[in-house]
């Protein structure tokens, strides 16, 4: 019912590769723009984990320091089948937890320890740095050609399959709540299911644009978003040359909606594409609006910055930086079949 094989911007890659043969083949490191204050109510820990989810590390840490899980916060979730570093914060006002800076357990360890005057939460991250190893690459020249393409043109900014749960399970739960009226008391789970539903509808809209080769073009009535910002404006011209240049300069991007109560910003051709999807999924849209979700916007174009690669006898190591909320797998799927 929920196919997650979205259309690609550059066609199906010629090259195949093996991905995630080992956790070290997918390395992720969180990036922050600012610095921690060095003082405050929150102990901030830089964690290295391997083969564990963020939630599993949080539970393990909570047991070791004898604290409720609710006192531990983070800025983002990191993959299980990976080697990742991320920051966790522990609310411990005026408290010293002996030995916390050297704690470790199977699958994780603490690399750094400091304090901060705010707890970590989504929005703190500026981005993530990825180091990815692809093994048994069958067509290195095709891979390199595609890397050069996406350096300048970017890729469709789909939500990755992780967003939807195993086998789309989060979408099944969302359907039960939004259409069948099932009650879910756990606010975290409910929010996760709603996020999956909105992401699904966003991907459907973006996939229509990819099929029509308009995902990176400013249609009449499009909402345009400044890259790296939530600032938006509406394009009231058809194929504005100045706007095309700004897209080429990675300054702005056409955007698609994360559904909710609408401010009716989008118009014209862009609105028709959105309405076609909303008409098909009207029950979901009604449910999201009834649950108080507000419409938001997400750029259509994802730019992978600081791309570097090394090739060694069929193995390719890729390194790049993505903004917070973006998925490395949507970059990889434009490069190789894995």
From Swiss-Prot:
- Report keywords, A-Z: Isomerase, tRNA processing
Residues making up the signal peptide according to the UniProt record: none
Q: Give EC number(s), comma-separated.
A: 5.4.99.27
Entry-linked PROSITE patterns = TRUD, UPF0024
What reaction does this enzyme carry out catalytically?
uridine(13) in tRNA = pseudouridine(13) in tRNA
The active site annotation covers: 79
Keyword tRNA processing among record annotations:
yes
Q: Name one GO molecular function term.
A: RNA binding
Which Gene3D superfamilies does the protein's record reference? Answer: TruD, catalytic domain, TruD, insertion domain
Task: Name a single GO cellular component.
Answer: cytosol
- Keyword 4Fe-4S among UniProt keywords: no
* TRUD domain boundaries: 154-303
Example GO biological process: tRNA pseudouridine synthesis
Q: Which InterPro entries match?
A: PsdUridine_synth_cat_dom_sf, PsdUridine_synth_TruD, PsdUridine_synth_TruD_CS, PsdUridine_synth_TruD_insert, TruD_catalytic, TruD_insert_sf, TruD_pseudoU_synthase
What does this protein do, in the record's words? Responsible for synthesis of pseudouridine from uracil-13 in transfer RNAs.
Tell me its family: Belongs to the pseudouridine synthase TruD family.
| PANTHER family, per database record | TRNA PSEUDOURIDINE SYNTHASE D
What is this protein called in UniProt? tRNA pseudouridine synthase D
